[in-house]
Structures are given as structure tokens and as C-alpha cells.
């Protein structure tokens, strides 16, 4: 592969897309693969109170700064590194003191619930995968993750799931399944399946 290519891994919250992206990162190695979480591009909300931030709909397309991400992807495709923002999920805003350096390696993976929603992002993808996982399993994974890793209460996770997460999944995320080059189940996969997917990605981007 002579220059950077962008691929996407999309799917519902807690579908396994982040795990898949990092499995591909591990297989390809850091010299060839880097991962950009779409979550890093949540719009900064430092100008409103924490209470107001907690009430925002984080599963709607407007929650993400897709323009900034597209600009960064264009820079990578031009051979330039970028400083991706880092998002603080406990405070619902960007960490203004830190960034994540992303270099124009062979394959840059954009992973997130709406990675396939934005036309301006789809325009630069060389390959795309949608991770399809049962809703009940996704909820159980989300509950465990948000309580243990993001400082959330079980009640708040339940409330957010019913109010925005699941409705927005049905409206904006699930329809993008049809836009993916490939659909994988998120219940489980083995090393062989990851290796075969990596081969297909390499073939598509060469």
C-alpha cells in the first residue's frame, strides 16, 4: 500500500465495533494501522453546565463534528499527521489539554455508531464494515461499560437507552447497515475471521 487509505467500522453502541477495530489494529500492527474513534469528535460543550451536558442527545448526528473529522481525514490522505481531540465522557466535553496524534499509516480505521451516516465521510472510505448485534446483548454490554468505565449509574444508563440511544439507533444507525461493503455479527468472531477480514481490507485498499 503506497499511501494512506481510510476504512470504517460502524454499528450500534456496544455492538463490538471497537473490539473489531482494535483486533484489526493488533493484526496489522501500529506501523500500518491506526484507529480514530468517532466518539473523539463529539462537539465540545465546555461552554454549558455539566447538568445541561448530561441532558444532550449524544446519539443524534448533530452531536458529532463530522466536518472536523472530514478535514482531518483529508489531511491524512494528503500524507499529513493530525491531532485528534480526546473526549472526556464523565464531563461530556473535550479534554483541552491533550490530543491524540494520528499519522498517515497504510490503513486508518474510523469506528463509531454513525461512521457510515455522513456522506462526506463515506466519500473517503475505501472499505466499510457494519457490526450487527442483538439489541439485548448491546444493552447489557453498554450497561456494564458505562457503569464501570464512564462513571454512570445504572438508572442513568437505562434512562438514556430508552430516551435516545435505542430510538436514534433505529433512526440513524441501523439504516447504514445497507451502506456497508460487509456485515459481521457482533456476537463473536475468531482469529480466523479477523484474518480473513484483514485480507479483504488489504485487497480492497491496494
Language-model features: locations:
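P-loop (Walker A) phosphate-binding loop of NTP-binding proteins
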Residues: 12
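Conserved nucleotide-sensing/catalytic segment adjacent to the nucleotide-binding pocket
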Residues: 34, 43, 47-90
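ATP-dependent NMP and nucleoside kinases share a basic, alpha-helical "lid"
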Residues: 95-149
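Hydrophobic positions on the alpha1 helix immediately C-terminal to the Walker A/P-loop
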Residues: 20
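Post-Walker A helix-loop "phosphate-sensing" segment adjacent to the P-loop in P-loop NTPases
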Residues: 26-34
Amino acid at each position: 500500500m503506497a499511501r494512506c487509505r481510510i476504512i470504517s467500522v460502524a454499528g450500534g453502541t456496544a455492538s463490538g465495533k471497537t473490539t473489531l477495530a482494535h483486533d484489526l489494529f493488533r493484526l496489522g500492527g501500529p506501523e500500518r494501522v491506526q484507529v480514530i474513534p468517532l466518539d473523539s469528535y463529539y462537539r465540545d460543550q465546555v461552554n454549558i453546565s455539566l447538568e445541561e451536558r448530561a441532558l444532550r442527545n449524544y446519539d443524534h448526528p448533530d452531536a458529532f463534528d463530522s466536518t472536523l473529522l472530514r478535514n482531518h481525514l483529508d489531511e491524512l490522505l494528503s500524507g499529513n499527521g493530525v491531532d485528534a481531540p480526546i473526549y472526556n465522557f464523565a464531563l461530556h466535553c473535550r479534554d483541552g489539554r491533550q490530543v491524540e496524534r494520528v499519522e498517515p499509516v497504510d490503513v486508518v480505521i474510523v469506528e463509531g455508531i454513525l461512521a457510515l451516516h455522513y456522506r462526506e465521510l463515506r466519500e473517503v472510505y475505501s472499505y466499510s464494515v457494519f457490526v450487527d448485534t442483538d439489541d439485548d446483548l448491546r444493552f447489557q454490554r453498554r450497561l456494564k461499560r458505562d457503569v464501570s468505565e464512564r462513571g454512570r449509574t445504572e438508572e442513568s444508563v437505562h434512562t438514556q437507552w430508552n430516551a435516545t440511544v435505542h430510538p436514534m439507533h433505529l433512526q440513524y444507525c441501523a439504516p447504514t447497515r445497507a451502506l456497508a461493503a460487509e456485515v459481521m455479527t457482533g456476537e463473536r468472531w475468531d482469529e480466523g475471521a479477523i484474518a480473513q477480514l484483514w485480507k479483504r481490507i488489504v485487497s480492497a485498499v491496494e
